[in-house]
């Protein structure tokens, strides 16, 4: 077994066990899943509901004044300003955005030096802001006069009293962690620990203390030991109560003068007013509710054709809850992990619903309801999950692999998408497995307990069928016989779920193939590939930076190549006209930036191993507050008991501040314990590795030509579309669509309704292998795959080789009275029979060319065996040349294997006069028996000893006398290995050797005859005419040799039974007896899976345990005698009776699963496949039923007398008999595949019985002859 097969087996077993667990304990699992959903959705309480997010309004800074308290526009006139923009805001927010870095970076610096010195400059900035005073003609104005004065914090925030300001201006900075004391900061050995000590230990999704003081999201601050960018960002937040334009302008000018930002291009032109809502409105809910209603309708109409579901609405609701809960869990977990998804985004919902939601739900439902309906609910759930386990896990692994590859592209946009997709996949998989599977098991259990016991007959529910061409005929009409041997009667399309409408076929095709998942996965791969290669912060830039850093020259060792003036314009606005990208000029080691003083450290201290990170400003820095949590500002004001509900705040333009620190400052600000740290500084990333936003004018923008990638993406999309069209063509178009001469007008064989596309079934004629050897009609047939045993009404048993058709042994009817008993009389009977037969070995030529009769040597016979016979040695004539030659036949016969010749087949020398004279001389009178009755075409009841005859007197043959048997005729017959078990009308059970023809053992005679037998392993069960059961066991006193096994198991069969040696002693013991199993004779007996099922004329069935004959259940559901029973290894039990009804039973619980009114008259034959129930009756009608729903799919009208001739070759192939022919049908669609005529001479003989062997052969009973037909090769390929 390969690794893939072992892995597949493990996954299947795990899903099987999970299905058993979910179906066994549904309520606890649903409660546990609900608690998990609530726990994962807890962070959503901190997120806004759809439609309740903050609303923004932008106004220019120039000439700004707070709006009046009352709106002055008329109600009917449109206004550019929103309704909430009335009066002064709660506060004005001014953020001073600081970007700081240590430049140049030395090799001996530590990772903690990246952020310790930049953070220490926050104290200086705060001091400069607090000391700023505006002096103008109106006087002086300080910060205390214009800022928002706050009082005490809320009583529950005692831990934050030393951090957040109280009784003064609301000013926030990272220095608040150390109470704005620089000495505390320098004395702190663990800065990161101090920053994170107030982080909540529980689930918390609102603004944290770190975000409030830093003013930027945590991942953008750069305060980490693992940061690649040696750039620290934070803000100093000022909250003003009044807007004072002059004070704000002077503060901005002073800070930009003290800390200039040469390459900054931030615009200070507009104010952003943010309004916070309080309650959700009905209008905002309409789009979301509409989306889920459409989803609910889609699932309902996709599952409404699934008949084995109790509540279609409930299933659709469970699917919607699954998808919705998956969406909510994904958003909640992503919010918990630091991502900030929004429920308003249109890109989240389609991915979760289409890719990981609906397809698995639909596939799981179809897989579970397609399991055998007679199984227990938990077994059906387990089998359904196990069958789809490999495809679910394979798709899951593929999607996770794509997401993992996308995450390592190092593109921030792709990484954020991949993180959200991983959480969505895992949450959806978690919900589908425990929750939806458990809900499905509850629904199927309700269906089993409620609906199936109350289901009306399907005929009572069928709508009247519309006539299509000719009237549909459900039953056989004796007055009008069809012109063709078969008439197909189909049910209406609403009840025939095998041929689905094209719309549903497309839906199930898309769900079964996971086409949507595959298309979106392919699109995701293409998108990730293009974005990863073309994005300036992607993998290509990272690899280029790594190669440059590992180069011995380094990037800083090379000066840019000068370009002669006049060749190309030096500063063309279009980068496509420049050979070199418009990068900022690289500095040599002895150069400094303009406006920056030279470093005092000299040449020795300026040596560094990597260039310093360049501080850049982009448009995204103007509105960095948008990346904060939407509850950032409400949380801050709520600490001081200020609510922002139905109010707004105004955000002023950001003041940029750039700080460049030299390595000496970093070394001076280092704590003594920092030198003991083992952390090494990470390698810097070039070009802004983690920054995917657009850059300013001074940022390097590489020329990107994406034409090649567009062409590749277009070609890939075209290929995917072509494959999709080909798949849809195979689904929608018929098999011979577009072929000439195949139109609907050219139909043969009587316009068969099953021929939907004008397909004409082929007709062939083959010469069968005819098995002849019985003088009367064959009543019993049995086979174990290698041997075939037949018994006729005369009591003669023939053993045939199922491969070659040779007659191996003939067991005679022991009807001749013997004076001796015991083994001698048996041997004598065998000896006399062999004198009459030819040993079963004949060539397939004409009968006249057959070899002389042969005799199986038995050794020297005992003298006492022939005491009652005359001495005929004097009659032996060795002069063969004088004998007349037999006339040759004019026409050849079909090839045959015969056990004896009929008198009309050949003529020979008449020995009657010689034998008669020898009898007279010995004083013996031969006895004659009456001629046998002509065979009856119908079922023949068991014959009594007085009714039975023997061989007719043949012309030219010795008149051996066969008296009526005292042992009774054969009523039942079974075969296993090389043992034949025979049940006689006298009540005697006999075990014969099929190869040697010897009687191995027998039981004592009982007054009641044996009507049915079961021979399974070493157990024999005999059902008697008085309703009793006898359980026998076979024992052998010689161990079996490992080589004593015949052949290999055939297709779909169990291993071949052992062959008992002739030296073994076989003993049959009676182990149990059930004296009153039924009140009337037992008419049907079957055994499988350790269970024995009996059917009787008392209208009941009983289920016994085979090992101890314990009666488990008595099944009552028929209103007539039981005529046929079916049971297999999967414990599928079906029964048919004289009332024409078919019942399906659950063997494990003894309950009736389904009840179907099948035929007008007795049900003569019954068999099942994995999805269908096939029945035949005396009305010569074969009906095929859906096993899960009990609805008739279609029926096949048989020839007169051929109603019981059917056999199942496989789950998809059915064979039926007709007048001298057999027909093969496709069980899935009811199509006639092929009709095989068995020669022209047998056309008038109906096939009364069909037995399917394991070697792809079929045995047809044509009265006293058997025909061995091999399945056509085209059908074997189809199977």
From Swiss-Prot:
Glycans are attached at residues 263, 590, 641. Its main location: endoplasmic reticulum. Escort protein required for cholesterol as well as lipid homeostasis. Regulates export of the SCAP-SREBP complex from the endoplasmic reticulum to the Golgi upon low cholesterol, thereby regulating the processing of sterol regulatory element-binding proteins (SREBPs) SREBF1/SREBP1 and SREBF2/SREBP2. At high sterol concentrations, formation of a ternary complex with INSIG (INSIG1 or INSIG2) leads to mask the ER export signal in SCAP, promoting retention of the complex in the endoplasmic reticulum. It comes from Sus scrofa. Belongs to the WD repeat SCAP family. There is a cross-link at residues 454, 466 (Glycyl lysine isopeptide (Lys-Gly) (interchain with G-Cter in ubiquitin)). This is Sterol regulatory element-binding protein cleavage-activating protein. Loop-1 binds to loop-7, enabling interaction with COPII-coated vesicles. When levels of cholesterol in the endoplasmic reticulum increase, Loop-1 binds to cholesterol instead, thereby disrupting direct binding between the two loops and preventing the SCAP-SREBP complex from exiting the endoplasmic reticulum. Residues 60-81, 588-617, 668-696, 834-868, 883-903, 925-959 are annotated as: Disordered. The keyword Oxidoreductase does not apply. The modification Phosphoserine is found at residues 821, 837, 843, 850, 936.
């Amino acid at each position: 077994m390969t690794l893939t097969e072992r892995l597949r087996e493990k996954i299947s077993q795990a899903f099987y066990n999970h299905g058993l667990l979910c179906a066994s304990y549904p309520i606890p699992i649903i409660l546990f899943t609900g608690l998990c959903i609530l726990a994962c959705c807890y962070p959503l309480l901190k997120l806004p509901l759809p439609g309740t997010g903050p609303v923004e309004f932008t106004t220019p800074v120039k000439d700004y004044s707070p709006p009046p308290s009352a709106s002055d526009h008329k109600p009917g006139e449109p206004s550019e300003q929103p309704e909430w923009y009335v009066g002064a805001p709660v506060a004005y927010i001014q953020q001073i955005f600081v970007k700081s870095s240590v430049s140049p970076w030395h090799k001996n610096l530590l990772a903690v030096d990246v952020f310790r010195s930049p953070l220490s400059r926050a104290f200086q900035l705060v001091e400069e802001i607090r000391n700023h005073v505006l002096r103008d003609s109106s006087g002086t104005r300080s910060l205390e006069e214009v800022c928002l004065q706050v009082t005490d914090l809320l009583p529950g925030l005692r831990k934050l009293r030393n951090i957040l300001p109280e009784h003064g201006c609301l000013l926030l900075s990272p220095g608040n962690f150390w109470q704005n004391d620089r000495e505390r900061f320098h004395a702190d050995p663990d800065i990161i620990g101090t920053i994170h000590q107030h982080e909540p230990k529980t689930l918390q999704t609102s603004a944290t203390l770190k975000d409030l003081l830093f003013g930027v999201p945590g991942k953008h601050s750069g305060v980490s030991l693992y940061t690649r960018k040696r750039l620290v960002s934070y803000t100093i937040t000022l909250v003003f109560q009044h807007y004072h334009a002059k004070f704000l302008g002077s503060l901005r000018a002073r800070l930009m003068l003290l800390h200039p930002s040469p390459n900054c291009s931030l615009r200070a032109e507009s104010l952003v007013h943010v309004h916070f809502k309080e309650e959700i409105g009905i209008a905002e809910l309409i789009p979301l509710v509409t989306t889920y209603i459409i989803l609910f309708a889609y699932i309902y109409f996709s599952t409404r054709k699934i008949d084995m579901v109790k509540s279609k609405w409930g299933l659709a609701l469970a699917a919607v809850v699954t998808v919705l809960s998956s969406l909510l869990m994904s958003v909640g977990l992503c919010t918990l992990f630091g991502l900030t998804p929004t429920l308003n985004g249109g890109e989240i919902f389609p991915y979760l619903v289409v890719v990981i939601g609906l397809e698995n739900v639909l596939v799981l439902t179809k897989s579970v309801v397609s399991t055998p309906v007679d199984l227990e609910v938990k077994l059906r759930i387990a089998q359904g999950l196990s069958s789809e386990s490999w495809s679910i896990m394979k798709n899951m692994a593929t999607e996770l692999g794509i997401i993992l590859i996308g995450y390592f592209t190092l593109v921030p946009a792709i990484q954020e998408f991949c993180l959200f997709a991983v959480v969505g996949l895992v949450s959806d998989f978690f919900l589908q497995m425990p929750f939806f599977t458990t809900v499905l098991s509850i629904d199927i259990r309700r269906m089993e307990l409620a609906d199936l016991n109350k289901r009306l007959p399907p005929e009572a529910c069928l709508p009247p069928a519309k006539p299509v061409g000719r009237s549909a005929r459900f039953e056989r009409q004796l007055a009008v016989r069809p012109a063709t041997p078969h008439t197909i009667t189909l049910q209406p399309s609403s009840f025939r779920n095998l041929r689905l409408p094209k719309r549903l076929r497309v839906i199930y095709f898309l769900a079964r193939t996971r086409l949507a998942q595959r298309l979106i996965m392919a699109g995701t791969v293409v998108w990730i590939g293009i974005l990863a290669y073309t994005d300036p912060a992607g993998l290509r830039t990272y690899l280029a930076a790594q190669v440059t850093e590992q180069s011995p020259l380094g990037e800083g060792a090379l000066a840019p190549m000068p370009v002669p003036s006049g060749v190309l314009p030096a500063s063309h606005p279009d980068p496509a006209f420049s050979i070199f990208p418009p990068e900022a000029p690289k500095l040599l080691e002895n150069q400094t930036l303009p406006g920056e003083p030279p470093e005092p450290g000299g040449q020795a201290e300026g040596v560094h191993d990597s260039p310093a990170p360049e501080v850049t400003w982009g448009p995204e820095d103007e509105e960095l507050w948008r990346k904060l949590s939407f509850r950032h500002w409400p949380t801050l004001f709520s600490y001081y008991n200020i609510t922002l509900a139905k109010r707004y705040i105004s955000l002023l333009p950001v003041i940029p501040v750039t700080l460049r620190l030299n390595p000496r400052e970093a070394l001076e600000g280092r704590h003594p314990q920092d030198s003991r740290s083992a952390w090494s500084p990470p390698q810097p990333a070039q070009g802004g590795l983690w920054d995917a936003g657009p850059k300013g004018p001074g940022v390097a923008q590489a020329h990107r030509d994406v034409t090649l990638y567009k062409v590749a993406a277009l070609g890939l999309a075209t290929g995917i579309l072509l494959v999709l069209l080909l798949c849809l063509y195979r689904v929608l178009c018929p098999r011979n669509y577009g072929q000439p001469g195949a139109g609907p007008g050219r139909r043969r064989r009587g316009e068969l309704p099953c021929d939907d596309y004008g397909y004409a079934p082929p007709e062939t004629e083959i010469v069968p292998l005819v098995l002849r050897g019985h003088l009367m009609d064959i009543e019993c047939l049995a086979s174990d795959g290698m041997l075939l045993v037949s018994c006729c009404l005369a009591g003669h048993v023939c053993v045939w080789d199922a491969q070659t058709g040779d007659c191996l042994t003939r067991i005679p009817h022991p009807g001749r009275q013997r004076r001796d008993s015991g083994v001698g009389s048996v041997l004598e009977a065998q000896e006399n029979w062999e004198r009459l037969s030819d040993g079963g070995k004949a060539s397939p030529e004409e009968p006249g060319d057959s070899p002389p009769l042969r005799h199986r040597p038995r050794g020297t016979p005992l003298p006492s065996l022939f005491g009652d016979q005359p001495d005929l040695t004097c009659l032996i004539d060795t002069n063969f040349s004088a004998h007349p030659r037999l006339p040759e036949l004019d026409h050849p016969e079909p090839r045959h294997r015969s056990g004896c010749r009929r008198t009309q087949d050949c003529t020979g020398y008449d020995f009657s006069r010689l034998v008669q004279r020898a009898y007279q001389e010995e004083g013996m009178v031969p006895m004659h028996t009456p001629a046998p009755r002509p065979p009856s075409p119908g079922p023949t009841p068991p014959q009594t000893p007085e009714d039975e005859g023997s061989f007719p007197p043949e012309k030219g043959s010795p008149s051996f006398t066969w008296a009526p048997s005292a042992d009774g005729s054969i009523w039942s017959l079974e075969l296993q290995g090389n043992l034949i078990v025979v049940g006689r009308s006298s009540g005697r059970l006999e075990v014969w050797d099929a190869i040697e023809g010897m009687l191995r053992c027998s039981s004592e005679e009982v007054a009641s005859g044996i009507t049915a037998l079961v021979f399974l392993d070493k157990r024999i069960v005999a059902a008697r005419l008085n309703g009793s059961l006898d359980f026998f066991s076979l024992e052998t006193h010689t161990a079996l040799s490992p080589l004593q096994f015949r052949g290999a198991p055939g297709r779909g069969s169990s291993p071949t039974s052992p062959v008992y040696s002739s030296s073994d002693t076989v003993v049959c013991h009676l182990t149990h007896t059930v004296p009153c199993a039924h009140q009337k004779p037992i008419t049907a007996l079957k055994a499988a899976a350790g269970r024995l099922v009996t059917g009787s004329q008392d209208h009941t069935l009983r289920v016994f345990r085979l090992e101890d004959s314990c009666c488990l259940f008595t099944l009552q559901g028929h209103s007539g005698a039981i005529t046929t029973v079916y049971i297999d290894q999967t414990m599928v039990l079906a029964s048919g009776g004289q009332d024409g009804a078919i019942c399906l039973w659950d063997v494990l619980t003894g309950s009736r699963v389904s009840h179907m009114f099948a035929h007008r008259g007795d049900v003569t034959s019954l068999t099942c496949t994995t999805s269908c129930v096939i029945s035949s009756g005396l009305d010569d009608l074969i009906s095929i039923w859906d096993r899960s729903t009990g609805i008739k799919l279609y029926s096949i009208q048989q020839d007169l007398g051929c109603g019981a001739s059917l056999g199942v070759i496989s789950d998809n192939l059915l064979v039926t008999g007709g007048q001298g022919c057999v027909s093969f049908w496709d069980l899935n669609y009811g199509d006639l595949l092929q009709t095989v005529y068995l020669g022209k001479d047998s056309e008038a003989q109906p096939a009364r019985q069909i037995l399917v062997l394991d070697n792809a052969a079929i045995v047809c009973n044509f009265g006293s002859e058997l025909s061995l037909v091999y399945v056509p090769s085209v059908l074997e390929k189809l199977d």
